[in-house]
């Protein structure tokens, strides 16, 4: 179980030195039980601490002001994904205190001698603050050699307590089993790595190669080789080679290989023989619809053939089987559309022919109507001419009656004029048949003209009907 705790930094001001105390979170599965004690980096004075202080008298301790204290940032996040800020407490003491249990200089990342009794009492580990900048590294070369000698003596004398302490340190920092301190100037790299870790906890982004979430290395365009960073004191390489063989401390940057690894499927070439065996197996399983990849694989019994190959090939086989049917359906639909189009064209032609016939019929009817109109006009003229002739005949008849009456009166009055009247009557009678003959001739001519006019429209009608 991971517990959330507060890291406190105590500042002990003195004339030349400053003491710091840290409270760090409990490890998850170890015996670090007392959570309320402070691990005093510059512990109580005793004989061993005085001797250690005498040996390390040449070390130049840097005075740290309250403004230049290392930034203490949390390592544990709450349920909402937001990192809990650590609170820093400062306490000033008038007397300077020498470091006995674990001297922690600002330019070093090594732990000095630790009392086993105090370690068992407190049960806490030191916290690694931010390293100094590269400008301070050059001034700390003289300090590194003496601190390395102290580190060697402490590691030899600590015993089982140091082993427990190093195990707890590994578990707290999530270090590998073969971690130790290597002498190489990597303060800037470590500082950047810690900043990336804190940013990742604040933003909820893991510094990992997981495919689901982006990496901070990718966001800030950092090379992926920063997974392991050596943490050591800034010392000369020659002194480190003389002291002991170096081993790198690899910080766990939470590179999880939990991403889904794509399984490399071996490619298979479907030869005609293999396809024939596949088709036989599918036919035995009552067609591609009812065939299953597992059953086809059992029936084929081919080495190197997997169910993934069968699945893909069966899907392609089904698609290829349905494609010709769809092509035939398309051809039938095209034929139907062509037949429908032909039928429509034939109907259009028929309708055009009918329209043309109706138009011709309308023209013929129009011509007949004109001919009938001409015949009616002729008939009216004939009737007028007949009335005119009738009037002439009536006038002639009246004239005859008047003449006959006049002759009868004259005969009774003067018999002398009787032969003359007779001769006049004879002349009149002789002229009367001549006029009658003339009238009959004119009537005959009129009737013949009317008959000719009547026969012409009848002949035209007969010609139209014949057409």
UniProtKB/Swiss-Prot annotation:
Q: Enumerate the subcellular locations listed in this protein's record, separating them with semicolons.
A: Nucleus
Cross-referenced InterPro entries, in alphabetical order?
Homeodomain-like_sf (IPR009057), Myb_CC_LHEQLE (IPR025756), Myb_dom (IPR017930), Myb_dom_plants (IPR006447), PHR1-like (IPR046955), SANT/Myb (IPR001005)
- Where composition is biased (Polar residues), the residues are 402-412
What's in the keyword line of the UniProt record?
DNA-binding, Nucleus, Transcription, Transcription regulation
Q: Which Pfam family is one of this chain's hits? A: Myb_DNA-binding
Known DNA-binding region: 293-318
Domain HTH myb-type stretches:
262-322
Where do the segments described as Disordered lie?
227-266, 327-353, 400-467
Q: Where is the composition biased (Basic and acidic residues)?
A: 327-337, 419-428, 438-467
UniProt keyword annotation of Transcription regulation present: yes
Can you provide one Gene Ontology molecular function annotated for this UniProt record? DNA-binding transcription factor activity
What functional role does this protein have?
Transcription factor involved in phosphate starvation signaling. Binds to P1BS, an imperfect palindromic sequence 5'-GNATATNC-3', to promote the expression of inorganic phosphate (Pi) starvation-responsive genes. Functionally redundant with PHR1 and PHR2 in regulating Pi starvation response and Pi homeostasis.
What protein name applies here?
A: Protein PHOSPHATE STARVATION RESPONSE 3
**Which species?**
Oryza sativa subsp. indica
* Gene that specifies this protein: PHR3
